[in-house]
Amino acid sequence: MTTSNNHPNWPSLSDRQGLLRDRFPVWTPLTLDGLLAKNAQDYPNRVFVLTDRQSWTYAQMHAWSTQLAAGLCHLGVKPGDHVALLMANFPEFIAIKFAIAMVCAVAVPINFLNKRDELGYVLKQSDAVMLITMDSFRNMPYCRYLDELAPGWQVQGGGDEFPKLKNVLVFATGENGSDNISKHLLLNASFGEGLVLPPGFAPAPNALCDIIYTSGTTGFPKGVMLSHDMLLRTAFGSAWARGFEDGRRIVFSLPLYHVYGYVEGLLACMFVGGSVVPQLKFDAADTLSAIEQHQATDVLLIPAMTMALIDAQKVQPSPLHSLHSVISSGGRAPASLWQDILDYLHPQEITTGYGMTEVTASSTVTRPSDGMTRWLTTNGRLRDVGPAGEPALNQRLVVYRVVDPVSGQEMPPGQVGELQAKGPGVMKAYYNKPDETAAAFTADGWLHTGDLGYLDAEDYLTLVGRLKESYRCGGEQVLPSEVEDVLMSHPAVLQAHVAPIPDERMGEVGVAFVVLRDKMSCESIALEALCKERLARFKQPRHVLFLSASDIPTTPSGRARKFLLSQMALESLGLITPL
């Protein structure tokens, strides 16, 4: 066996990929429950999921998920039904996720930062027949939201407002008492106990597995439809491209309702019989402690998290001897970040990349052998996924072309245009949104990403901006129109326009430009309170600026020119010198 030069006891990338090829020499389409069953047989006593208090082997997780699946079946969940899952990174999320697959149902993971109306929209639009929710988490009162959305939900499910929602199960997090919730509605250790999962459930690999909601240009979230095999081929591709060693152990606090933590962490580790240490929330000290305590070899981060870890290491360094790999992706990163990772986290391999829910997760990554220049100047190379890839696409699942957004002409290497994606890793449709689906694709079947960038001659991709007005705050996508609608619900507000500005910690943050009605007044604190009440934290604007209608730069058709608003915000806040 050969070894990496910078870590003499570590297998080389070719050896690690060889192990994966030995286990999966030819790609055979898989399902989530099928992969869990395979690992429960191949690695029954290997730890799969760890917390600071408990761990579950593959065999134990399979048994737990089977029990939960029997409980779901007993409550009437049928193949093809949609089961909404509003839960943080508890082990129960993982167990119920596989249970949903076992009964051939479709999971609808929901962002647990969603407020009442956001939750209601997803429940209705997804046609969920069941909701599995926490009672509360980080002071988010989900049961109160249900009381307001669907009074009597404990007895009649969604009622008239959500006629397809038949059952709600509640997981008690321990934050608040759940004494007022009937025991038969609780997702606890006894749920499904004594029941037997009927035979005959066998989801097809190309069957719908998840509907994962992402913001879009319509002002409302859109449900991206992903099959079992799309998810697992992409997850295998992550393990292949990053060179997972046997038994890789991954720490992350990225939420499992996102493809980043779900695909690149939970599912990817399964292909090497590895384990995950999911954390309920991000805390730099806790993350470093988890790496040490559980001897993790990998950590999944967005740049804001990476910078927080580096800051913590500067104050009270941990040795992190086990940490071999760091992936930092999903937002803007300062140029100093990559050297700081080497200096303070000491990994042997660093990865960054680019992806989105519509392409199932990462579709470009830097290679383990890449160095500082690639980290600084690119978002990775089109990802070779080994045996899981398409031979016609050079063993890739997603390929990109760069197109002039005005003329539609394909651009040569090095020229900036809109990035468009195609391949078996690209979604087929948004759930129950035919118009949005049609608008998302070109006439010849390429997905509009809405991002501007370029490819070089070696297929490395570099992002330079966004065609869309949406932006990412802390890795979460924000749609300005959604924030603007909330601001304009205030009686004193005539116009509201939200535009992003760069932020070293969060990647981008929103600035709200507000025009007040004549003879009416309003303080920024009132608008901030309104947003705090109605919107998830990452959607709340960092700054509120007041101006007159004549000061809003507009197109001839009267639409606000957001890139000029971003420039105005930077000048007004003193972050750049006015031109």
Residue ranges and their predicted role:
Residues 4, 471, 497-503, 511-515, ...:
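Conserved C-terminal "lid"/linker of ANL adenylate-forming enzymes
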Residues 24-29, 33, 37, 45-90, ...:
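Conserved AMP-binding/adenylate-forming core of the ANL superfamily
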Residues 30, 75, 86, 409-414, ...:
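Conserved ATP-binding/catalytic segment of the ANL
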Residues 44-45, 162, 169-170, 175, ...:
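Conserved pre-ATP/AMP-binding loop-to-beta segment of ANL
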Residues 57-59, 209-233:
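Conserved AMP-binding A3 loop
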Residues 75, 105-184, 518:
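Structural core segment of the AMP-binding/adenylate-forming
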Residues 232-249, 257-298, 311-312:
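Conserved AMP-binding/adenylation subdomain of ANL enzymes
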Residues 293-300, 310-383, 399:
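Gly/Ser/Thr-rich phosphate-binding loop
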